[in-house]
Amino acid sequence: MKRAVTFDFWDTLVVDDSDELDRRALGLPPKPEARAMAVVEAVRGVADVGESAIRAAWDAALATFYEQWKVEHRTPHVRERVASVFASFGLESALEAQASLVEHLATMEVVHPPRLAPGVLEVLHDLRGRVRVGIISDTIFTPGSGLRRILRDHNLAGFFDAMIFSDEVGCSKPSQNIFLEAASQLGVAPDALIHLGDRGVNDVDGPRSVGALGWLYAGVVDRHPEGWGGAPKLLHHDLIPAMLDGLGVP
């Protein structure tokens, strides 16, 4: 059986919020505050609106997004959150200000990118030619286009046969649809997928729902010290080749 290995992006391929170290060194505020400040500045650039009202509208837009992500299993592009804030103040026609803000929010982690998880480059070299390799990742602020740029800047993009990002396919983990889409793009049966990620529900239960394997990666953050559903737990990417050997993958 032809196999494919897919990786989560955040806290699996890269260390989430490791960019905060660089931001701090440059005297920049943490990303949540930087985003809120940018929203306030953008709205106040086109209308006389109080800062507290803008921040409240931004918080409401974020709450709506997290409901869509966690309950509806979809992650609309950040432009929807921006549009919601502007609409709160009757500023739907301020399209230039919205577009500029969207670009800023969507590229914040591209300008100051996260660092790679240990051993990522080496394992991708090891997997090349042995299995099909993909990414299955939810997108929160940085869309799929931005995550591709981060991968290119780390010289990793060429290792992947398919990249499935939730804002582009209209569904997010643990939806069955995102794993079925990955299998389709990688040219393998769903039960030939082996997915690696740091979250039990998303990265173990999700792939298992389509007959695929889900492995926990705890090399950056161990979210499940007691394990999750008997899934293998890997503390380093260099364990993947031996795990494939154990499955009889040539």
Task: List each model region and its residues.
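Conserved acidic, metal-coordinating active-site core of Asp-based
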Residues: 99, 103-113, 131-132, 162-166, ...
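N-terminal helical cap/lid subdomain that shapes the substrate entry/recognition surface
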Residues: 2-117
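Asp-based, Mg2+/Mn2+-dependent phosphohydrolase catalytic module
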Residues: 1-9, 15, 30, 41-52, ...
